[in-house]
Amino acid sequence: MSHIQSIFAQIRDPFRKLSFYSLPLSSETSSVDSNGLKNSLKDAYFGLEKALTNTDADLPLNLCDYIFFPIVPVLKSWYRVPSTGVEYAIQCVNLLYKHGWREAHNEMLTMQLLLMLLNIADGWKSPSETVEQDFRVREITFETLENVITDFKPNFHDKRQYLLFARALSSALDIIPNKNSSRRLQFASLCCVQKLICPKQYRLPTEFLTTFLPGIVSGLTKGLAPNGTCQYFKNVCISLNILGDTVVKAISDDNTKDLPDEKDASSNSHFFGPTKRTKSWKRATCQQLSNAVKAILHLRSSQNLHVQDALFDFCFILFRDCLDSLKDCRIHLLESMLKLINKKENPKLRDYGMNKLVSLIESFNNITMESVLTECLNDWSTTWSSVSTFASEDNKLEELNRLKSLLSISSHLPKTLQLMEPLLDGILSQLVPKSSGIDSNSQKLLTSSTSNEYIHGEFFGGNEMERTTQEIVTSFAKAPNVKYVMQSLLSKATSATNENSVRAFWAFMVLLKSDVETVDSLEMYIDSLEQYSFEVLQQLSQLNVFTKASLEDKQKKEKYNLLCVRSCIAIDSISWISSLQGVKFRSKLMAYFYPLLEHLAFASPYVSSFAEACIQAIATNCNYSTPAELLRENIDYVVNSVALKLNTLDVSPQLPIVMAYVIKNDDGGCIRYIGDVVDAIFGILDAYHGYARLTEGLLGILYAIIKQESINGEEKKLIVGVEEDAMNEDKNKPCKKIREFVQLLLENPNYPLPKDDHELEDMIHDEQQETKSGHEQFREHAMKEKEKKGKENENMGETTVDHENINSNVMDEQGEKQKDDVVDMVRKITEKAQLFLSHEQITIRVEMLKLLSYGSNVLAKEPNTFYPAINTFWPLVVIQLDTDNELLVECALETIYQVCALADDFMTSRIRQDLLPRLETLCQRWHLFNVARTYSSEHRLQRAMLKVTSACVANKLSIVVYLKLMGITAPIIRAITHMSQKYAGDESLVEETWNAFSKQNPDAVYYEREVRGSQMIDTFSTELLIPGKQRVQRTYRRTHEVLEPVGAKTSETVFNDLLGQQGSGKTETQEEPLPSLDNLLHLNQPKKGAKKPLISII
């Protein structure tokens, strides 16, 4: 069986059944079985679809006629058939056309099908009677019409075909603005319109397109209007494509440039002739099209990417081909394209759209484009004059973005930029200087360009308004008269300090940073920028007059923000100039380095971040590896600047921080310079000690020096410890002592091998020799061999010089000398600082106590200097505990803790006589045995007291002093333990304190933690009295401890009472659960060493 026979066999029965039910439709009077007809149409459609599913072959025309025969009555009398049946019938026609009639190109059949389908779509029962058609039937009908129209090639000179074309076009256009139309129906009708107007198989004559142009524009515009029905993105895109192609074909500049006047137009001989194309027709049509285009351009605010692409293509072809015809809307077309290009969500359009637009502008005549851009800029100026004052920020930003888009293409025609120069001041006035709310990360400020770095800062809030304005200012760099613009900005910037001058300063810097190509004397403007920036950097004193209280005033706060922004703009300019000059900028470091360090030390994080970024950029641009290397290479500049400030009594709040920064990054190499500065400070303090603010600033410098030197010493210890640990952890390398021992072996190969144990015992003659290790004996032997060798060389006159040892000795001597210089400088500073411990100003006394605390770390390296210093400042420090200022007391306790921890047993008598009575009084006055609030002054004093007592017990104290310290410490610990909200470091501090006391007397600590802390003071519990109960020393913290009341007995008294109770209530067989009093009283007695063996005595 052939393929066609197989299809026929499958569809024969369904279509035979359909013929039976559809034949009555041929007569108007015969009755129709609606259900049977509907079911037969359904079976026929599904049978045909099933038969044609797995085949690509076309149906023969005779088979198509056989199938179509029972469907024709349904199409003609569709109003007598249920809508579902009509739907199945039209779908059968669609299948027949796709698989058979499409290749036949039967003109008459195509026209008949079009007419029948249009009647069904429009609901025509007769030329005089219509009904509302079912929406589902209309959708299927227009989808079928789309396929049928593809084969329709009308002859417009044939009236019948002309009218059929007009009816099909009008029916499709009527559906687009209809509110009852679905998306599917709109899409199908738009596809029909597209195939009718823009066919691929033939060219629609322009004169006939002109006839239908008003209806096409009207129908599509109504659908695309803001309140139109065409909202689905696919429908919008196809509507824009149809409208663009239609307008370009009808009124393009090439098609309308030689139109005749009205009187010269020839009349048409056809009775249905096309519209006459004359100049008056062009004016009327272009006006209608301009209004339509303006109504459609609201789509540029759409967020759909497909709509944005379609609208850009629509505007582009109209701007390219109808620039002269659509003069009324070409400004709107250009602005719409620029707005679409600048949308962030469509980067693809931004890339290819700008390239197309720039290429188009370059291809046009300059005169024409200058005229267009001039119109655009004049229109923007008119709008901006009404918006800039009263409109919201969003509206202003929208207009500025519009201007930015226009200026982006105006750069290709620089003459048009002259129109915007008068409006530059108004544009800059929208910026408000802001120095707060901006990220203060210095690394984010830096911008790399090849091998150089410079700052790219934000000064007006870092918002979109600032970025847009910056791009607008940058576009003026290619203006012909940019020279005059820069002169105007520079004169405004150097005038009185106000918002306008700061904005002009910023705009002047932005213009210079951009590629200014039309200025001949560019170096002159760069020098002017550098000079003014340097003047601004030297005016930091204007910012130091503001205090925290003064910033509460709104006007003063605005002035402060203004000065901060101006300083940051100057710093930005200096970094950019250093990137231009590179290594040549090194010669200017003498002038710029110290002002930048002052700004680095300024209290505002905004200003200090700019200064830090600038120093980093200068270090990179001048070929320094790090800012620390930059400082070490130019340390003399900084110290000389500090000395100059001191000589003129110009002590700013930034001087101490600058000195701290210098010491931190110089690795101790600045000592030889700072010594002169310290001497100058001493002289000023002696002469002007009555000036509190000057004194505070100078003492702050000394405090910064001491603090940083102490921190540097601690960091060096840590670094050395880490290096040794790393060396010990390296399994592939021996430790330092073994390597030294191996080196000695290589230098002394003749050293005898060690003896065995018996031989060594015979060779021991005294106790001293017995105690020497083999390594020490070997070292002594090596030294003797070296001395012996040296004597032999002297006798022979052949003495040699060990250059390596000499160099190492010289370096050691230099290191020792530098260390002595540091200690001597710190000693002088501490001697001067202790004179101000009695100053009437609390802040100065607090700073001096901190200075002594840090200075003790340095002085402790030389006990011969440290102990006499303690004798001098100790009485002045201890007396601070009697004051009523909690901050002063806390700092005094911190200093005492530092001194006691470093001086060891040197402080024993002072602890007993001077410190202990004051600590007891301090606890009562400040109620330190009570539970305090977290972070309160009492809480801080409790923590400081624990540090002091833990440092005191490390000295050789008597048992009485020890128990008194325990009586102070234990209640404070219980108070801290029972706080509702604990400080993060409280637990570790408590454990450290218990461990410090436990090293001297673990029994006392056990009693305080286990007995008093468990509420067993009144009567012993049976658990403690059980025979065999052993005491276990605990080195960890208990979780259940009870606060001791303020009036409770001291630890010593209660402990002795409990010992008495124990002795009276125990039997001889019971073991003692508590420590004996003998252990406590013999706390400090040294243990007797083991007896030496007899052989050592011999």
UniProtKB/Swiss-Prot annotation:
Keyword presence, Cytoplasm: yes
One Pfam family in the UniProt entry: TPR_TTI1_N
Entry's Gene Ontology BP terms: 'de novo' cotranslational protein folding
Keyword rRNA processing (UniProt): no
Family, as annotated: Belongs to the tti1 family.
Record's subunit section: Component of the TORC1 complex composed of at least mip1, orb5, tel2, toc1, toc89, tor2, tti1 and wat1. Component of the TORC2 complex composed of at least bit61, orb5, sin1, ste20, tel2, tor1, tti1 and wat1. Interacts with tel2.
Purpose: Component of the TORC1 and TORC2 complexes required for the regulation of the cellular respons to changes in available nutrients.
Protein name: TEL2-interacting protein 1
Organism in which the protein naturally occurs: Schizosaccharomyces pombe (strain 972 / ATCC 24843)
